[in-house]
């Protein structure tokens, strides 16, 4: 984006060269400002990412990797020093902090995955594991799959679950900020 902008500005300024050195200075000023804006945006994004908890960073990373098939990803668990299981990381920020339902908790307790077909989407619920195989919560994954695509949904649900587990050292680490 920044390079394209610079080329666009340069093509607009070059015909004005006959006006003197101010054109060159104007171009350099604009180039420096554009570069500063690009760098500032990158630094801001890094700063925002470092403020997120590990769980949210993993959700963002996995969701981006599996688009467009993955349309929702949410992680449920009890935060340290909490007695309630809530959604603590999600692709839908409006759901963060909402209590886990009894059905959600049943999946965690019994360890039996659930697949729900809802019109044009499929939702898979299963235990969220850490890298040692310990249960740390619940994963809810929504896919852009319809009736007849249950096998694909189950396969991708398992893949997402395994990708998450490999990156979770422990339950408490899910709630820590920073990289």
Protein language model annotation of sequence segments:
Residues 43-47:
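Boundary at the C-terminal end of the N-terminal hydrophobic targeting segment
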Residues 60-81, 174:
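Short N-terminal helix-loop-first-beta-strand/juxtamembrane motif that initiates sensory/input modules
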Residues 1-25:
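N-terminal secretory signal peptides that target proteins for export/translocation
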Residues 49-56, 143-179:
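Juxtadomain coupling helices with adjacent low-complexity linkers
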Residues 26-40:
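Bacterial N-terminal signal peptides
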Residues 90-116, 155-159:
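Extracytoplasmic/periplasmic sensor domains and loops in membrane signaling proteins
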Residues 137-138:
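Short glycine-/small-residue motifs
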Residues 120-127:
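A short beta-strand signature within small-molecule sensing/ligand-binding domains used
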């Amino acid at each position: 984006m920044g390079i394209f902008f610079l080329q666009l500005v340069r093509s607009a300024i070059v015909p004005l060269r006959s006006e003197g050195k101010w054109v060159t200075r104007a171009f350099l000023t604009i180039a420096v400002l554009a570069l500063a804006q690009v760098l500032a945006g990158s630094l801001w994004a890094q700063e925002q990412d470092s403020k997120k908890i590990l769980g949210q960073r993993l959700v963002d990373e996995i969701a981006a990797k599996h688009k467009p098939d993955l349309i929702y990803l949410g992680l449920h668990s009890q935060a340290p020093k909490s007695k309630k299981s809530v959604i603590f990381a999600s692709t839908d920020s409006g759901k963060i902090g909402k209590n886990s339902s009894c059905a959600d908790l049943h999946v965690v307790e019994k360890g039996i995955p659930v697949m729900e077909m809802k019109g044009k989407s499929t939702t898979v619920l299963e235990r969220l594991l850490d890298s040692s195989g310990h249960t740390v919560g619940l994963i809810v994954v929504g896919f852009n799959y319809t009736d007849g695509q249950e096998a694909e949904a189950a396969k991708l649900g398992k893949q997402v679950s395994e990708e998450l587990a490999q990156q979770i050292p422990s339950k408490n680490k899910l709630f820590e900020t920073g990289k």
